[in-house]
Amino acid sequence: MSDVKVYPVDPNVAANALINEEQYQEMYKRSIDDPAAFWAEQAEARIDWFKKWDNVLDFDLRKGHIKWFEGAKLNVSYNCIDRHLEKRGDKVAILWEGDNPAADRKITYRELSALVNKFANALKARGVKKGDRVCIYMPMIPEAAVAMLACTRIGAVHSIVFGGFSPDALRDRIIDAECRVVITADGGMRGSKKIPLRKNVETALAQCPNVHTCFVVQDTQLEIEWTEGRDVWYHEAIAAASADCPPEEMDAEDPLFVLYTSGSTGKPKGVLHTTGGYLLYASITHQYIFDYHEDDIYWCTADVGWVTGHTYIVYGPLANGATTLMFEGVPTYPDASRFWQVVDKHQVSIFYTAPTAIRSIMSQGDALVKATSRQSLRILGSVGEPINPEAWEWYYHVVGEGRCPIVDTWWQTETGGILITPLPGATPLKPGSATRPFFGVNPKVLSNEGKEMEGPCEGILVLDHPWPGMMRTVYGDHDRFINTYFANYPGYYFCGDGCRRDEDGYYWITGRVDDVINVSGHRLGTAEVESALVLHDQVAEAAVVGMPHEIKGQGIYAYVTLMSGVEPSDALKTELVKLVRKEIGPIASLDVIQFAPGLPKTRSGKIMRRILRKIAAHEVDTLGDTSTLADPSVVQNLIDNMPK
């Protein structure tokens, strides 16, 4: 790893940053040596409590037992809105950019307060009370954040289902979380297309007899069916409600939200996060990792249907009194310069997006980026999967013009917030590395036998101590929580990812542990092979899986998407085989390369490798659940064009 390029911290960035290297080392040491004292100090400084805690931390990882700030009382909406009103009442809280470039809205903290209070009262008027579950199935409009915060105001537990999910997936999540109220919109906009959200809800609710209320936001004027007595127009409910709703005092360990994430087997898991620890962790990670200052305009391009949207569009930024930008559209509409047009229009200073979006824009060339200014940008971020070094370099040099540190963040739905990440003023950067652990995070690397390894090594990434933002259970199934995260390696939280730790103590995420290929007894992380493939200037994206091999046990099967205008050829295949051998070694000889116009992805942009593994093994009759695919036709195309 010694030939890896290192980008030192810019002295100007360090001078103005909230955390420099010396402070990072001192705070990190304290957070590991005495976590209870460290987090108590942060909780005092960051959160307004109605009552302080009796005990900072009580845990037993073997039993999946984790409690932070027991006995403390707080309210999330109070911390995200009320406490800012005196000093920041007229500051923009939510800056909304519509799918249509001409559409935008600005909502101040004072205006947000009135909307949240009114909708909280509207929920109460329909019988919603503390502890009730409420399903939110919304487009990326401000009302989605209002609905989340209104639930927290009265102690209801929200369960957001991403607006791209099918009626069946929505039904399953409504039933599993036992929701009796649904909040939706008549439709949503995505790349100039109208998405029939309410129609999907109607289909789902036909099989959800326990849902007694459905609030509908009028957004796209799509015609919808109406069920009298059950359905309520959002705008009418708001108009009739009082703007005064006292915040419910919640225990720190009361549930805040349930968010479903796909399991490697069986039905989706309802990840349950609680109130005090989660909000504290959202606040501290948002402030320090993005080096957030009071005058920043902050934009995370995620959807609130994913955990990134929960923590880094809504709760983290608003807890810190920030202006958070919500974007309804897609990166390629009206064209692939849209992100940078929005950055210039709103003078965005902190920008957080996913590698899949970066690669998609990158494949369209540099001209559309360079046609924009982007001078307001000072911090760039990456989230969702490991970013390959080539995309990192392009993001750094072309988008950020070498001025903006990239925070390549590793975390999960289950962790509530970022765990491994650079800090802009403290961490020298290595393209493709998530670098170092955040405060209170103590990663360990285990061998296949479950033994801790020291120094530079490669193995299974685990954590041996809880942090405040971690999930507390799988909703309604604590045994599944224990079996998934704690049973494999007792005493550790098992995250399912592999990693490499280098000589500087930097962590490189090598992909899911089930995405490890074992070639003739040698372990290869799929992310490493993919990173090698996309070094080729004609490759837009690559996904690599293991395939059955008579001699080697597993061979390497690569699915490769090419840059626009590039034609597949045998000569190109030969170049790619040589490139991977050169980058990783002869052990990484590709057995099959399948060129494809697209890869099967979920609606959040994650590649569905399970399906790719099935195709590579010619097990196309047992693909399993494909309901979360953004474009099912991609799979059929791959099957039809499998190399003979």
Curated annotation (Swiss-Prot):
Post-translational modification, as annotated: Acetylated. Deacetylation by the SIR2-homolog deacetylase activates the enzyme.
Binding site for Mg(2+): V534, H536, V539
EC id: 6.2.1.1
Broadest EC class assigned to this enzyme: ligase
Highest taxon above the source species: Bacteria
Residues given in the record as CoA binding sites: R190, G191, S192, K193, T308, S520, R581
Any one annotated GO CC term: cytosol
InterPro entries (alphabetical): Ac_CoA_lig, ACAS_N, AMP-bd_C, AMP-bd_C_sf, AMP-binding_CS, AMP-dep_synth/lig_dom, ANL_N_sf
Name of the protein in its database record: Acetyl-coenzyme A synthetase
Gene: acsA
